[in-house]
Amino acid sequence: VSDDPSNLEFQPRAKGSVMGFPAHEGRPGALGEVHARPHPLIEKPRVLVQLAFMTEGGSGVDHAVLSELSRRLGIAAPDRQARHHAMKWGKGSLRWERHTEFSTYLWEGPLSESGRSHEDTPFGNGFSPPGTVISGIRLEIRKWTPTSERLIAAFDPTSLCYSLVERGNAAIVTDFRQDGDGMTRILVLDRGLTPARTGALSQRLIDIETYRTLAMLGLPLALTLSGRARRIEDRLAQTTLEMKVAETRDSQTLLADLTELAAELEADAASSLYRFGASRAYD
């Protein structure tokens, strides 16, 4: 604002400032993160195929995969520090995102009304996975018609999940089963969603299935530690009983037993800290 308080015309602010005050250096990145994952605009009918890979090899493996895909298209590869990237692929588009311990490759393309997809995903010959697959999703978006309703019969009725969303303008169908390609199938029947709402709904469904699978990575470890915890409890109870009734064992021996139990318990807690923390974050 000009020096004259009666003049309400706003003058250009200094770059990196808020109301004339210096902005924190991390503020642009923090604000930009809100817009890092915009919902795609999706016209129907459409098919989305996403694979999520565990990236134990680090971000360099993803960059090598993206560089090869870019080379095949004759375009520039993304920056090594990039966390997301998009490119045209065939009749659709490919979006990549890097997360803490996994990365996702999402291909979106056309789907004919007859039920046949024109899929030319990058996941065919020549695609080098950056790690092992933890989640695979195939999501089809179709107009809600009597013909498309018949596709519900292809899902397992014993585990069928059917939900009406968006005030009844769309239905979500899945059975959480995997098809012959190992993909979890989701069907969205649409009778009035805008491309923006369709994109937002699709992204949420894909995120739910991806994070559901990642959260369950802690289950095998929890089952293993559950048995170990029971054994530690039994040994602690036995040692405590000996402290009360046995006169033959000296205090140093009992103390050594207790110390060993404490160390074993602490080691198990430390080894599970990251996995359980990740499961809570994914939940």
Predicted regions: what they are:
Residues 79, 214, 235-245, 267, ...:
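Intrinsically disordered or highly flexible coil/loop and linker segments, enriched in small
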Residues 1-140:
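N-terminal pre-transmembrane cytosolic regions of membrane proteins
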Residues 50-52, 185-187, 278:
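Structured core elements
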Residues 105, 162, 211, 274-276, ...:
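Sequence-level detector for tyrosine residue identity
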Residues 97, 107-257:
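Extended alpha-helical interaction modules
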Residues 253-283:
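Membrane-associated alpha-helical segments
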